[in-house]
């Protein structure tokens, strides 16, 4: 280690939304911006140009407001329609039942990064990008990070906020291959319903449509989870054939699907491994990657950042990291369990699916159950 005067308090590896939110929150909690370092392999311009759609919960909006990263261009979700294809029964979660302006919001990754980058800049946070961490050495009093330009950055604590982890593999890590691939695109419909999101369970996996205003005011962000071989077929179809397949899977609640953007895909799996050592900890995607059903991955990561910032604001010490691990167990366990159960329970065929479809209708009549699910989706386990 170098002289402690040159050692920063917290190095955050990964300047995605979760890493930047943590940095801005640490500054908000009183840590000097010059004592916080953000390290990322991407240039800021590359991150800002990312067109992916992301879902933010109402709780995440509150966090962004606190650090001056809200408002941003986003479409509000007022209600969520949940159904099972081919079976009776559906459930509706509505903002009017929960005294909030929206259940959540749909925005583009680049819009969120732009806002968070501005918050970090105003806080005077040190940003090192593009740069990769090629190695690390943990000492009793800190961690030395080796960067790809040959330099060394010394920190009291290191937070892995994206990608791999520094800590040892947790023997209780939960991994799962869903044998599903998510096909993503932006699509337009002939008769949209403003501010309504859909979660439609099919034999191969969930199909989500999230309202996202485009130039025609009729656009949705599509996340369609299917078997890998089906995903390959969908990617090869021309636009007309793709829209026809989508209409068959979703139904006619929004009229006809009239246009689609280019499509992309990514493999789905569960990897919940919140690895940690005395001076390193993983949050966000480095701690858990979830199935996209219910859109909880980023929001769970932002809750990680909020709790960690609160604790490290009391001191950048191993004791605070240990307390963080304990404090996040319940929310992580419930959110991971909920998304995993939903992804697996509604995929498949057979008589059980009819019962599951009917269960949505029963669920819709039980106000306390709907309220609990909405609370978990907006704020996590508090």
Which positions does each model-derived feature cover?
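Conserved N-terminal helical subregion
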Residues: 5, 75-170, 176-182
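N-terminal FAD cofactor-binding segment of flavoenzymes
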Residues: 48-85
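Conserved FAD-binding catalytic core of PHBH/FMO-like flavoproteins
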Residues: 157-254, 258-263
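FAD/FMN-dependent oxidoreductases across multiple families
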Residues: 233-300, 306-318
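Beta1/beta-strand and adjacent pyrophosphate-binding region of the FAD-binding site
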Residues: 3-16
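N-terminal Rossmann-fold NAD(P) dinucleotide-binding loop
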Residues: 19-20
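C-terminal helical "tail/cap" subdomain of flavin- and related membrane-associated enzymes
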Residues: 309-382
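Glycine-rich FAD pyrophosphate-binding loop
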Residues: 25-51
């Amino acid at each position: 280690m170098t002289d402690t005067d040159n050692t920063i308090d917290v190095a955050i590896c990964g300047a995605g939304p979760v890493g930047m939110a943590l940095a801005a929150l640490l500054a908000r909690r009183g840590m000097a911006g010059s004592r916080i370092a953000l390290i990322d392999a991407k240039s800021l311009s590359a991150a800002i140009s990312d067109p992916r759609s992301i879902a933010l919960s109402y709780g995440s909006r509150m966090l962004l407001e606190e650090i001056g990263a809200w408002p941003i261009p986003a479409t509000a979700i007022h209600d969520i329609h949940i159904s099972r294809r081919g079976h009776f029964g559906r459930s509706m979660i509505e903002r009017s039942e929960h005294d909030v302006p929206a259940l959540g919001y749909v925005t583009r990754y680049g819009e969120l990064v732009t806002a968070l980058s501005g918050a970090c800049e105003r806080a005077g946070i040190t940003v090192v990008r593009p740069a990769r961490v090629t190695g690390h050495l943990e000492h009793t009093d800190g961690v030395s990070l080796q960067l790809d330009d040959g330099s060394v950055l010394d920190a009291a604590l290191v937070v892995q906020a994206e990608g791999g982890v520094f800590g040892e593999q947790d023997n209780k890590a939960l991994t799962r291959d869903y044998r599903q691939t998510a096909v993503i695109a932006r699509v337009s419909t002939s008769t949209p319903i403003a501010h309504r999101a859909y979660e439609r369970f099919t034999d191969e996996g969930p199909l989500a449509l999230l309202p996202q205003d485009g130039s025609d005011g009729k656009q949705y962000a599509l996340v369609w989870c299917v078997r890998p071989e089906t995903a390959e077929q969908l990617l090869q179809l021309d636009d007309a054939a793709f829209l026809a397949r989508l209409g068959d899977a979703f139904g006619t609640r929004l009229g006809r699907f009239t246009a689609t953007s280019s499509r992309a895909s990514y493999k789905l799996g569960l990897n919940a491994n919140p690895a940690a050592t005395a001076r390193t900890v993983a949050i966000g995607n480095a701690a858990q990657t979830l199935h996209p059903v219910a859109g909880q991955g980023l929001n769970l990561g932002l809750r990680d950042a909020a709790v960690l910032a609160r604790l490290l604001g009391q001191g950048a010490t191993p004791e605070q990291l240990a307390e963080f691990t304990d404090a996040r167990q319940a929310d992580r366990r419930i959110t991971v369990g909920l998304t995993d159960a939903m992804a697996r329970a509604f995929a498949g065929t057979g008589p059980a699916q009819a019962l599951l479809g009917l269960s949505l209708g029963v669920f819709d009549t039980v106000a306390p159950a709907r309220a609990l699910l909405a609370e978990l989706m907006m704020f996590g386990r508090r």
